């Protein structure tokens, strides 16, 4: 998912997406440990999506604090 698409979402939607991606990452790690993961690169992509969301949430938090 691109950062541009994520920036269009509200904070609540981003937090929901973050929770969803963390669950997905946990499942991917479990599948990888068991040995049944077809695309291990999916773990890396999911971690990057999580990082993008956290970055956008932090940027918004800082812009709100700076505006006060």
UniProtKB/Swiss-Prot annotation:
Any GO BP: translation
GO function term, MF aspect, one: structural constituent of ribosome
Keywords, alphabetical: Ribonucleoprotein, Ribosomal protein
Pfam families, A to Z: Ribosomal_L29 (PF00831)
GO cellular component: a single term: cytosolic large ribosomal subunit
Keyword Ribosomal protein: yes
Gene3D superfamilies noted in UniProt: 1.10.287.310
Family: Belongs to the universal ribosomal protein uL29 family.
Protein name in the entry: Large ribosomal subunit protein uL29
Species the sequence originates in: Persephonella marina (strain DSM 14350 / EX-H1)
